[in-house]
């Protein structure tokens, strides 16, 4: 009877849930959802297990293409806005120094403390998202970002401004962690590449556009209007996000659905994930989010070396926000607005890299197909090799052509290879870390994010000292030598990566897990053949294998995307915190029906 009802449910078209109701009521249900034959008997001992129903109108994977892409652009803009706010502040730096009689190093803290706040994202907001959902987190943190920006515009002294900038960065870091999770909630891995690419470019475009906007606004209206504009911008994004972003996190949606069904029917309903994996407690969430990234960072050479490489590149980007004013404003006499235009060279390199990345995604898709969806992680590295070579070329070129005796266009063009290589290195290495650590990818990404945020905060602090003591040529050469020292890393991991991963504890466990998934895939294909010959006989083992395979393939997205990764709860979403066993049986219980 239950099978008949299920077949009938599959044929029926569920009632749609209006967008406004999805935004305001995450637990909204339809008659089809209420009457669906969930497994269980509805008692405390054997509750109904709530899962997605066929063609579920509330499943983010079933959103229309228009809705998916609208949400993608909203979260990408939300991410870009935060990154832009981090650097636009520099446009009013001269006026801030004059008004508060502050040294250049103190002024630079306004950037450093904001970027330091980015380290909060994966440690605090990721577990909060896990517990309370993505929508509520966006609403609260972006409102706080807007408020702190507005407060900064009215700061009576330098200390207040710096404190408000730090809190703005801390709360603003939420989209950097959770926006990718929203995209992963809506798109299967095979369709996620372009969406993740759009999201991934935001953290690079924002810092480059910031000095351009902040520079012109600062010199025409003053630094307080720079902060005021940032408050208005973030406020508009907050309003748009509050209107267009429904809750997309499946565990939270199904948990709220279970609560609603229990209230409506008087029976006991529970989310399948909460029953099979155990409801995640606040202590568990924060313990994993706060501790495991550090364990992976200091015990896994792969994570430490590649994260350090990416942190150096990221720190160099933020170093330029202090270096370019010295090179172009002090030595060439440019105004802050015109000086901000110097970043257009970096911008051009970033855009060129995104084109190359899209082409490389096609290459990787072919390679992945040859390996039946299980391409070695090292196949992610070819573009990192190209980008790794481009970065020192651009930095050395810039270092020795940035003097006023050489035409300004030469040094600006020289910054393009840096922007080009930066994006290729970031996207490629992020994908490599995700594929190499699958079930631990979220913690790896968290470690990577924290380390690069620390470098991004630290590099601007010593930049002016370095340029004063060494001069603009040798000071610009130091990050070039650092980048040059890191050039061999992608080569070495491309050649020896497989052997290195087997010798690393967590990478080895992830590799063993992938081998089991490959076996599960083979078992599934064999069971499909048996079913086609013998009829639709239920096979629990093949079902579990399929569910596990779906989950891990969902995790192996590329920004396809920097993708992130296997992560948090194990839904295969790299932006969620890891709380899963490497055992196949354990993972198979948290099946794809929760998505």
Curated annotation (Swiss-Prot):
Glycosylated residues, chain numbering: 62
Pfam families xrefs: MFS_1
GO MF annotation terms: transmembrane transporter activity
Key words, A-Z: Cell membrane, Glycoprotein, Membrane, Transmembrane, Transmembrane helix, Transport
InterPro entries found in the cross-reference section: MFS, MFS_dom, MFS_trans_sf
Membrane-spanning ranges: 69-89, 106-126, 136-156, 166-186, 197-217, 225-245, 301-321, 336-356, 381-401, 409-429, 442-462, 478-498
Origin: domain of life: Eukaryota
A single GO cellular-component term on record: plasma membrane
Induction data: Is slightly over-expressed in strain TIMM20092, and azole-resistant strain isolated in Switzerland.
Disulfide bridge positions per record: none
Compartment(s): Cell membrane
Membrane topology: Multi-pass membrane protein
Function: MFS-type efflux pump involved in the modulation susceptibility to fluconazole and voriconazole, 2 azoles with similar molecular structure.
Family note: Belongs to the major facilitator superfamily. DHA1 family. Polyamines/proton antiporter (TC 2.A.1.2.16) subfamily.
Record protein name field: MFS-type efflux pump MFS2
Gene: MFS2
